[in-house]
A protein has these predicted regions:
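Beta1/beta-strand and adjacent pyrophosphate-binding region of the FAD-binding site
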Residues: 1-11
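A structural signal for isolated positions on well-ordered beta-strands in alpha/beta enzyme cores
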Residues: 4, 27-29, 113
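Conserved Rossmann-like nucleotide-cofactor binding loop
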Residues: 11, 15, 36, 139
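Glycine-rich FAD pyrophosphate-binding loop
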Residues: 18-41
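A short acidic, helix-capping loop that chelates divalent metal ions and anchors anionic groups
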Residues: 37-40, 85-86, 214-216
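Short, solvent-exposed loop/turn segments at secondary-structure boundaries
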Residues: 40-43, 90, 217-220
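Conserved N-terminal helical subregion
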Residues: 48-165
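Conserved FAD-binding catalytic core of PHBH/FMO-like flavoproteins
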Residues: 105, 128-131, 135-235
Length: 235
């Protein structure tokens, strides 16, 4: 059997790994448009419930990625000068690039054919394959080529957000609510790299607001640096 996978992100790579573990004789090719070390975003988060499923499905890969985890059990909400803490949730964060590197290594060791900097226009690029998997993201060309079958829909939400990174440590999944003369801003922040998982602490810091607030703050015409400075002053 031959399988072609469009998209070398975590989903495509992990599917390839699970299929290879299930049947090593299957020939699997993963095709990715970007380079192996290209990534978008900072960190990824998994709940303990999801990680339990990963551990049961593939203990070896679970052990490989778990060395990179930053774990926390609490959720902190900061609002009106107070901190509200809720415990017992269980999450782990890690660098998205770190996750890709681990999965690429495992897939390569299992004999998956990984091809980078290669475009996929549609299922026809995998003409000899018995199964084609579309793991090519929100704007999937594979899914679009069978739009009448999959009937995809996009529900675009109105809020505006900026995805920032910081070297500040967060011991909990952290939410801030901060209001000024322009309106209400909210943040969710989490640590994805720490002393155990990397040379320095790194965290994701996402700021969100309504479009009306975004415009009143003048952020609709702000540069990246001006946006960062505004958020830095606010939080």
């Amino acid at each position: 059997m031959k399988i072609g996978i469009a998209g070398g992100g975590p989903g495509g790579l992990y599917f390839a790994i699970l299929m290879k573990r299930a049947d090593p004789s299957i020939q699997i090719r993963v095709v990715e448009r970007n380079r192996p070390d290209d990534t978008f975003g900072f960190g990824v988060v998994f709940s303990d419930a999801i990680l339990t499923q990963v551990q049961e499905a593939d203990p070896d890969t679970f052990r490989a990625v778990s060395d990179h985890f930053v774990h926390w059990d609490d959720i902190d909400v900061f609002i009106g000068g107070e901190r509200i803490r809720s415990g017992g949730h269980g999450f782990s964060g890690m660098s998205r690039q770190g996750l890709l590197t681990v999965l690429q290594g495992v897939a390569g060791e299992l004999g998956v054919d990984l091809r980078y900097e290669t475009e996929v226009e549609g299922p026809g690029d995998f003409g000899e394959c018995d199964l084609v998997v579309g793991a090519d993201g929100l704007s999937s060309r594979i899914r679009e080529s069978r739009r009448e079958h999959f009937t995809p829909s996009v529900d675009e939400r109105p809020n505006r957000f900026v995805w920032l990174g910081t070297t500040r440590a967060f011991p909990a999944f952290t939410f801030y609510f901060r209001e000024n003369e322009h309106g209400l801003f909210r943040v969710h922040a989490y640590q994805y790299q720490g002393p155990k998982s990397g040379p320095e602490v790194r965290s994701t810091f996402i700021v969100e607001c309504t479009e009306a607030t975004w415009r009143r703050a003048g952020l609709d015409g702000a540069s990246e640096e001006e946006t960062r400075a505004y958020c830095d002053g606010l939080f």
